[in-house]
UniProtKB/Swiss-Prot annotation:
Disulphide bridges: none
Keyword match Lipid biosynthesis: no
Protein name as it appears in the record: Glucose-1-phosphate adenylyltransferase
InterPro entries documented for this protein: ADP-Glc_PPase (IPR011831), ADP_Glu_pyroP_CS (IPR005836), GlgC_bac (IPR023049), GlmU/GlgC-like_hexapep (IPR056818), NTP_transferase_dom (IPR005835), Nucleotide-diphossugar_trans (IPR029044), Trimer_LpxA-like_sf (IPR011004)
Originating organism: Rhodopseudomonas palustris (strain BisB18)
SUPFAM superfamilies, per database record: Nucleotide-diphospho-sugar transferases, Trimeric LpxA-like enzymes
HAMAP family (alphabetical): GlgC
Enzyme class name: transferase
PANTHER family, per the entry: GLUCOSE-1-PHOSPHATE ADENYLYLTRANSFERASE, GLUCOSE-1-PHOSPHATE ADENYLYLTRANSFERASE-RELATED
Keywords: ATP-binding, Carbohydrate metabolism, Glycogen biosynthesis, Glycogen metabolism, Nucleotide-binding, Nucleotidyltransferase, Transferase
Positions contributing to alpha-D-glucose 1-phosphate binding: Y107, G172, E187, K188, S205
Family per record: Belongs to the bacterial/plant glucose-1-phosphate adenylyltransferase family.
UniProt GO BP: glycogen biosynthetic process
Catalytic activity: alpha-D-glucose 1-phosphate + ATP + H(+) = ADP-alpha-D-glucose + diphosphate
């Protein structure tokens, strides 16, 4: 973990996290919460990864801009990220959209979400702004990116990674020269340009940017005065700097935190139900690509005070057991079997049930004799006795949200309709 001695640039930086998006492709999972507040990995929220990266990198001033259905997110931040101390020059600010610039406007775009809070940022006088998206899963040392930004004299440094070209239309895509200077940038192109020598890959923006604070404010004020701008970093700010200034690409491979030297870099969008399910289930592997057990780069979060998980009953056909699964505190597995399943806090599984490849959010109650396969179950759902999911695709699609890959998202309103 970086600290104030070996991370001098980070101690002069503020991390500004954009956490206002809904994440509509997650369907009903974001009906009640913003995407950054969605649960991940057994006990965390998605936003905890960006925040933990900032903290572990040595950054001690953090701000989070919120907008869409922010209550769950704000409550989590208040509970889990309240340990910053002003007397140590630390700060943690939650910045809901509050019509600070105009009484008629909320945040109009990602750039506007920073512009409306310029006065708050100025009060802390950071030298650098590390601008982050709050809805991705990855581990990264931002100090490395700050160092490249300073060494190359960049106006903006953009975090980037290689993605399959067929997936690149959802990203900002760039082209760079031998010195990593960006000479073209297009946001979410319909036909993403390939990388030289790699026709199936594109170089994509991670939505992570480093700016000198003074330069950023100048650009935000210029953009705010442009009536033709959508006030978005990817669509407006970055392309303008590429054309009129110096934009540099920072490869994620240079600063990602790996579980071991040979490990591949890990970054996930988890923006769809399928991707969300897969990234959680991957954690059940013997050696998962994402290492949550790394004490040198912990993922900080709010931990409820709950008792240990408990497994009860040991009879043939009624044995409480879990194979290749993650089971969080407060769970009780009563005479049922879990395989490749991830349970969040406080889940109760009653007897004679079999659950396979499931992601079950906190405080779900699964009644007796259920067979659940390839499911994501939202927080607090009460699964009725004898429910079978994962065996009849047509029936599943009629009752729940079933993806093309066969993953069923189950919420309480869906269960209520079954019982009506």
């Amino acid at each position: 973990m970086s600290n104030g001695v070996n991370a001098p640039l980070a101690r002069h930086a503020m991390a500004y996290v954009l956490a206002g998006g809904r994440g509509s492709r997650l369907m009903e999972l974001t009906d009640r919460r913003a995407k950054p507040a969605v649960y991940f990995g057994g006990k965390s929220r998605i936003i905890d990864f960006a925040l933990s990266n900032a903290l572990n990198s040595g950054i001690r001033r953090i701000a989070v801009a919120t907008q869409y259905k922010a209550h769950s997110l704000i409550r989590h931040l208040q509970h889990g990220w309240n340990f910053f101390r002003p007397e140590r020059n630390e700060s943690f600010d939650i910045l809901p959209a509050s019509q600070r610039v105009s009484e008629e406007l909320w945040y109009l775009g990602t750039a506007d979400a920073v512009y409306q809070n310029i006065d708050i940022i100025e009060s802390y006088d950071p030298q650098f702004i590390v601008l982050l998206a709050g809805d991705h899963i990855y581990k990264m040392d931002y100090e490395q990116m700050l160092q490249q930004h300073v060494e190359q004299g960049a106006d903006v440094t953009v975090g980037c990674l290689e993605v399959p070209r067929r997936e690149a239309s959802g990203f900002g895509v760039m082209a760079v020269d031998a010195d990593d200077v960006i000479h073209s940038f297009v946001e979410k192109p319909a036909n993403p340009p390939p990388m030289p020598g790699k026709p199936t890959m594109s170089l994509a923006s991670m939505g992570i940017y480093v700016f000198d604070t003074k330069f950023l404010f100048e650009e935000l004020r210029r953009d705010a005065a442009d009536p033709n701008s959508s006030h978005d970093f990817g669509k407006d700010i970055i392309p303008y700097i590429v054309k009129h200034g110096k934009a540099v690409a920072h490869s994620f491979d240079r600063s990602c935190i790996r579980s071991h030297a040979e490990a591949a870099s890990y970054w996930r969008d988890v923006g769809t139900v399928d991707a969300y399910w897969a990234a959680n289930i991957d954690l059940c592997d013997i050696v998962p690509e994402l290492d949550l057990y790394d004490h040198n780069w912990p993922i900080w979060t709010y931990g409820e005070i709950v008792p240990p998980a408990k497994f009860v009953h040991d009879k043939i056909g009624r044995r409480g057991e879990a194979i290749s699964s993650l089971v969080s505190g407060g769970c009780i597995i009563s005479g049922s079997t879990l395989r490749q399943t991830l349970l969040f806090t406080g889940v109760r599984v009653h007897s004679y049930s079999t659950i396979e490849q499931a992601v079950i959010l906190p405080y779900v109650d699964v009644a007796r004799s259920c067979q659940l396969t390839n499911v994501v179950i939202d927080r607090g759902v009460r699964i009725p006795e004898g429910l079978v999911v994962g065996e009849d695709p047509e029936l599943d699609a009629a009752r729940f949200h079933r993806t093309d890959a066969g993953i069923c998202l189950i919420t309480q309103p869906m269960i209520d309709r079954l019982e009506a």
